[in-house]
Regions:
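ABC ATPase signature
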Residues: 10, 53-54, 67-68
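Conserved ABC ATPase signature
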Residues: 50-54, 58
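Short, glycine/charged-rich "phosphate-handling" switch motifs in NTP-dependent
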Residues: 122, 134
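ABC ATPase nucleotide-binding domains
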Residues: 153-177
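Helical segment within the ABC ATPase nucleotide-binding domain
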Residues: 89-102
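A short, proline-enriched helix->beta-strand linker immediately N-terminal to the Walker B motif
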Residues: 69-73, 79
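ABC-type ATPase nucleotide-binding domains, specifically the catalytic core motifs of the NBD
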Residues: 9-29, 39-44, 48, 152-154
Length: 177
């Protein structure tokens, strides 16, 4: 779901119905629809509006809501906070927590490491397509190297260092001390 994948020409309700298309039980579809509207009250107010006219945050909520219409056991979210205002990032974060607490497993791919690790059980730090570190999310949040990298360690010329550079620098610094 990177970006906001909605059917711009369909209404909010029509977008949600497409998410439950594999379900033939009308009562189950209605229950899923009600659950999504309860989870996203902003969408309930805009249910007859065309999705292309929704704000970025509302489109992201709609995309997540549409995925939830299928009542998944696993929800994969790719960059759900992409391009959102900080207030909306908090709302999306809270929604992800609620989805998980309701029994749906969530696989979250996110560049906002602080947000992602604050709600995750386990995390993987990737760089150029490779896992460079993994572990319990709470431990990763407290890791000095992760904090230093995500706070933006700058080299002598002011360039941003990669995680590997930070690890190499710190190992060398400790060894030479």
């Amino acid at each position: 779901m990177e970006g906001r994948r909605v059917f711009a020409e369909l209404t909010v309700d029509e977008n949600l119905v497409t998410g439950g298309i594999t379900n033939t039980d009308r009562k189950a579809i209605a229950a899923s629809h009600d659950r999504v509207m309860t989870m996203f009250p902003l969408l309930a107010d805009r249910r007859k509006d065309v999705a292309g006219y929704l704000s970025g945050g509302e489109q992201q909520m709609l995309a997540i809501g549409r995925a939830l219409m299928a009542d998944p056991k696993l929800l994969i979210l790719d960059e759900p906070s992409l391009g959102l205002a900080p207030k909306l990032v908090g709302q999306i974060r809270d929604t992800i927590v609620a989805i998980n607490e309701a029994g749906t497993s969530v696989l979250l791919i996110e560049q906002n490491a602080n947000m992602a690790l604050s709600i995750a059980d386990y995390g993987y730090i990737m760089e150029t397509g490779k896992v460079v570190m993994d572990g319990e999310a709470a431990k990763l949040l407290k890791d000095e190297d992760i904090q230093e990298f995500y706070l933006g360690l700058h080299g002598d010329e002011g360039e941003r260092k990669s995680f590997r550079d930070v690890k190499h620098y710190k190992r060398r610094k400790r060894w030479l001390s």
